[in-house]
Swiss-Prot record:
Belongs to the glycosyl hydrolase 56 family. It comes from Tabanus yao. This is Hyaluronidase Tab y 2.0101. One of its GO terms (cellular component) is extracellular region. It catalyses: Random hydrolysis of (1->4)-linkages between N-acetyl-beta-D-glucosamine and D-glucuronate residues in hyaluronate. Its EC number is 3.2.1.35.
């Protein structure tokens, strides 16, 4: 596996790199539901192979090369009833009130159903975005997790003042959150030991705007140091870089640099001889408009990933992008005019 210091990577189990001196190899993985495009999908599979893109056999969305699991098991969660606008607490709502044994039991069921091959050796990505294992990161749209955590402590300790309540809420959500995060990886690796497990989007960086463009905000680095246990139990680190139209190109590449730098930093901190490689999730459209990202911008973004130490990119797409014949035809044109030429250029560089 890559040590992030100007190395060349030879494939182990086809997927993951091991290193010798020289230029680094940059892998490209396909996580787009192009099986929804029956008129184009054979052409896409054939040309992906020609351009060195790693894709599941038969264009399956979950297959032999990569499987993305959305909220597997029974992570504690707070959802909202859309009709009554009332909160629903699933498995306790927050980790300190959750049943870890129940979660692990249902996790095993989900993994057995979604990754049926016990010898699966591809990328296994856990997409977990319900809450964060750091208390202060559960603000804004995630503030229900802070509020419930504080309420639980107030019920347990009515004599506590506000500062004491907050400190105890922080301590407990992070303690039990760590158990859910870590034990999920341990269980997953026991069930599919050859798979390359990791959590989608971590480490968070919160960069791209104002003063912190090409580096994480300072508190994010402190927080990531505190969740080193996640990366020490991961086989791969999967940060995410999605773009919006209001970011200038220099800020787009800065966004990439900051997030890749942080992922590489965490990989280097892992106390193992073989450091986890960094594979960056990227969407080929702007998330605010769903317009295709230009060839110029895509080239700059992919080169920024490679230049800053990423081992590869996972190109992700939504079913919404490909839910009509017109969209499928347009996407094939985009592949021919933009993505495949960019992939060739970045692999050569």
């Amino acid at each position: 596996m890559k040590l992030h210091q100007g190395l060349v990577c030879l494939s182990v189990l086809i997927l993951l790199p091991t290193c010798i001196l020289g230029d680094r190899k940059f892998e490209v993985y396909w996580n787009i539901p192009t099986f929804m495009c029956p008129d184009q999908n054979k052409t896409i599979m054939d040309l992906n192979k020609k351009h060195g893109v790693i894709q599941n056999t038969e264009d399956l969305f979950r297959g032999d090369k990569i499987s993305l699991l959305y909220h597997p098991g029974a992570f504690p969660a707070i959802t909202r009833n859309k009709t009554t606008n009332t909160l629903i607490y699933e498995n306790g709502g927050v980790p300190q009130a959750g049943n870890l044994s129940l979660h692990l039991k249902l996790l095993e069921k989900d993994i057995n159903e979604q990754i049926t091959d016990k010898n699966f050796s591809g990328l296994a990505v856990i997409d977990f975005e319900l809450w964060r294992p750091i208390f202060r990161q559960n603000g804004g749209s995630l503030s229900d997790y802070q509020n419930l955590s504080l309420k639980l402590e107030k019920d347990l300790h009515p004599e506590f003042n506000e500062d004491q309540l907050r400190k105890e809420a922080e301590r407990r959500i992070e303690k039990f959150g760590r158990s859910f995060i870590k034990q999920t990886l341990i269980k997953a690796k026991k069930l599919r030991p050859k798979a390359q497990w990791g959590y989608y989007a971590f480490p968070y960086c919160f960069n791209g705007r104002r003063r912190y463009v090409d580096t994480c905000i300072p508190s994010a680095k402190i927080d990531n140091d505190r969740i080193l246990y996640m990366f020490e139990n991961s086989d791969v680190i999967y940060p995410a870089v999605y773009l919006q139209t209001d970011l200038a190109q220099k800020n787009q590449t800065g966004l990439v640099k900051g997030r890749v730098d942080e992922a590489v930093r965490m990989a280097k901190m892992v106390k193992k001889p073989a450091k986890p490689p960094v594979l960056v999730y990227h969407r080929y459209v702007f998330t605010d408009t769903l317009e295709y990202i230009s060839k110029e911008n895509t080239t700059a973004v992919f080169k920024a990933m490679k230049d800053n130490g990423a081992d590869g990119v996972i190109i992700w797409g939504s079913s919404f992008d490909l839910n009509s014949k017109e969209k499928c035809a347009k996407f094939l044109d985009y592949l021919r005019e933009v993505l495949w030429p960019v992939i060739d250029e970045v692999k050569r560089s």
